[in-house]
């Protein structure tokens, strides 16, 4: 996995995926052993195959290829490299959520999103959720750059980003926010509660 053990605990998204993978593999009779980013990777030599969970740089992908094991990626689009992968249709999820907000009468919609890096600190391109959010609302004439905050995918970052938006926008705070992860939503909700901003009456998440 691209995370360390400590980092995974602050991102329930990847923790849930890993637990699901392990449960299904065990039900199928496979023995699973976990290797986190800061573990000894030489253990991979003992495996029959590799499930790589997370975001990886070209250099790290080459390192994984060098073991000569069957290799599949989860949450990384590696088809262009000739590797099988399982990914989420993030774009469709964003559009579905934004359409719901519009149906509920929201015209001012904000975004909290993380900027991901690979385990070896290689920056990734703009998050597809952020890109889709911007394109969709721009087409509707509703996109506001000041309603968008980019940080890390963690509860603490969600808290800090919402704190900054509350301070900067005051009464102009959007009536709805799309949260790019559960961890961000948890942190943002804590900030809103501390400021006694009613959810979902004043702000919907």
What are these language model-derived features?
Residues 1-9:
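N-terminal helix-turn-helix/winged-helix DNA-binding helices
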Residues 2-3, 15-32, 49, 65-73, ...:
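Bacterial carbohydrate/catabolite-sensing allosteric modules
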Residues 12:
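Conserved catalytic/binding loops enriched for acidic/polar residues
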Residues 35-43:
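Short acidic low-complexity segments
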Residues 42-55:
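Short, well-ordered secondary-structure micro-motifs within conserved domains or adaptor modules
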Residues 55-56, 183:
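Alpha-helix/helix-capping structural signal
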Residues 58-60:
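Short, charged/polar "capping" segments at the starts of alpha-helices
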